[in-house]
Regions:
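Solvent-exposed interaction patches of small proteins and small membrane subunits
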Residues: 1-144
Length: 144
């Protein structure tokens, strides 16, 4: 059975992180490049936002006995295959997972343009993910 309390905590964390990073959502590329503290705050917050999404996905995948993902990006593909999230959101989250891998393993090569683009265009995708997870959990309750 899906642990709704665990998922609820993770969804609340996503809200908290989105509020925190929202202060940077209108930053210019030049402002971002010039401030290493902002870079670290944004990179780390994006990292833990993505981790929270992956944690939720892995919990659902395990509980529902879906196929095991081959990596972080594939986690979202498994959710799409099982109709938890749609194709467009899946593709966006796969890119986010690959970005997460760069932040964690190749941090010296982070492209500031990509980070600022995420800030400007993709923060709302985390909200879409939250809504999809809540909808999925609700549909699972309706089946009982």
């Amino acid at each position: 059975m899906v642990d709704k309390l665990l998922i609820g905590r993770k969804l609340a964390q996503i809200d908290t992180y989105l509020k925190q990073i929202g202060d940077f959502s209108r930053i210019s590329l030049n402002q971002y490049k010039m401030n290493w503290k902002t870079q670290r705050i944004v990179e780390r917050t994006l990292h833990i936002l993505i981790e929270a999404c992956v944690d939720i996905a892995n919990h659902i995948i395990s509980d529902q006995e879906m196929r095991l993902p081959t990596g972080y990006a594939d986690t979202f593909k498994v959710l799409m295959e099982n109709k938890v999230i749609g194709k467009n959101l899946c593709e966006t989250l796969e890119k986010m997972a690959r970005f997460r891998n760069v932040v964690v393993h190749q941090y010296e090569t982070i492209d500031h343009t990509i980070v600022v683009s995420i800030l400007h265009r993709n923060l709302r995708d985390f909200q879409k993910y939250k809504k999809a997870i809540i909808k999925y959990l609700s549909s699972q309750e309706d089946r009982r």
